Amino acid sequence: AEALNWLVFPLKPQSKIPLTQHGFKDATRNADQIIQWWTQYPDANIAIVTGAESGLFALDVDPRNGGNEDFDQLSTELGINLQLINTPQSLTGSGGFHLFFQYPATQVIRSGKLSAGIDIKGDGGYVVAPHSIHPNGRAYAWEGESDPQEGIMLAPAPSKLLALLVGKAASQGATVPTYRNQWVD
């Protein structure tokens, strides 16, 4: 995480609940702190903070809520097969996936719902990272050859996707992000 310059923090084992007192506000890039956490809690899950501070955001696709169909429809509407973009993608323990992009320099991406089956993980959010274990016992993993530790860089999001995400946030009003759904994967 430190090499990737992403903010991380520990989650309770096989959980999406923060292990530290202040949750994502305790997130760090500091290698010594990261080593201390996982030495103390070797079975802890890993959370990656999303948003401007980490320099990334993610689309969180959940098939249990129609996410695969929503994602296909989104790709069709944008005229872009988003899964073919060379950017990190992780498989979630619930059978969904996270598609990671560079956080844009000039726009704000807030966490929220894009559709019933797709969450936006931006400012105020986090995702459970690969090498974690879902509450159902399945592991999170990097998809194929999209592991950022193997050199895959965050791609910029397509401009059509950014326009949709920024428009969605504007239509929802400039409110403080809610954390009610932050642990949904």
Regions found by a protein language model. Give the residues of each.
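Conserved phosphate/metal-binding and DNA-contacting active-site motifs used
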Residues: A1-Q182
